[in-house]
Amino acid sequence: GESMTDQETPERAHVTADDIEAANDLIDFIEACPSMFHTAATIMAELDEAGFTYLPENAAWDIEPGGRYYTQRNTSSVVAFKVGEDLAATWGEDGVAGDYHFQLTASHSDSPTFKVKAVPELDGAGETLRLNTEAYGGMIDYTWFDRPLALAGRVLVREGDRIESRLLATEREVAIIPSLAIHMNRGVNEGFAPNRAVDLCPLISAGDLKQGDFDALIADELDVELEQILGRDLFLVNRQDARIWGWADEFISTPKLDDLACAYTSLQAFLGAENAHDVSVFCCFDNEEVGSETKQGAMSTFLADALRRINGSLGFDDSYHRALAASMLVSCDNAHAVHPNHAEKCDARNQVVLNGGIVIKEAANQHYCTDAFSRAVFQAICDDTDVPTQAFANKSDMAGGSTLGNLSNMQASMHAVDVGLPQLAMHSSYETGGVRDVMYAIRALTAFYERNLTINGAESVEL
């Protein structure tokens, strides 16, 4: 086949010490984020450390130019923003927007996994005890077999007249989904479609635990009484260690690469960039893997509510829609790299490779929000920053996926581009990406935040 774009493939750079440092920092971030609730908590801790002010949604917001703030919803979605010191709500006679606009990135905090049901236990053969789970998102089921599994999420605990949310991440492996031996399933290698209600029930005890023990063990983990537990959102976590590997240190493999790689790189870009003339916004939404149609998802009012409140607190009530028209969103969600054994699954020309640079995704059916205008803006920023880019489009006889850019645009419409890091095995319990692409993404997104865009409709933009 041909190369991934109509441009010549550039000479590949070797992995540098900076690349490895960035990839190791990503691994540390992922290991701190075993659930969407931990992802939000980890992000908010970084924002606190960087001097951001927390603004609860149920409190009044007092926002000033030069300030740095964040809010959260459901303890699983975060919107953070920095107000430029030189922000001004002025428009010229020709209608070109002045300084007041938003430049945003959006990623998501969740990954496909299995959620523990309200009544959590199932008896198994003999004296075994299993967990009663259901699928969260579209995972590759067979990748969950024979892996060390922990539990992570949140538990709602009653303390007198108060109910509070507690984070939980077991420090030990507590479950495994065992394969059926090939001697009992001779046709397994000819094709196996696991039944999630039968084959994918995790084993948690060979006989020492009984019905009712699960919540008691959760109570012990949290050092509370069993009767204090009123609710829980707990998910299975693959406890395989993340690692950088390969003779040339080219690869990073880890659970949850989709989409914590984008959450991490966009957060680092947001924290490291400086722009005195705009409102820079970082978004990390929950529930992308199950459609985003929740109060904390990209399709909710969360982002639009925050932007309106920023606008109102700054005293720019009449300028909100004009600001949106001058704004741009970079939707950050990973992209499919061409598979080494299945090149036929990708478009012959619009295919991408690991360590080839940040991916710009486009689809005629509008499942990605990229158009010629937004592609041109992001491409120019990457060109000026010497960050390589790759063009991705689905093969024309394959449906492909979608992401959160167009969904968030339903509530707050603006120019938008879909980008991501290339990876293999998307929605596996253990995914693989390229080490160099982590730093490429940080550099590209930092440049986006630092470039003060002056957008005139869809006709022109000053970089």
Regions found by a protein language model. Give the residues of each.
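N-terminal hydrophobic/helix-forming segments and targeting peptides
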Residues: 1-463
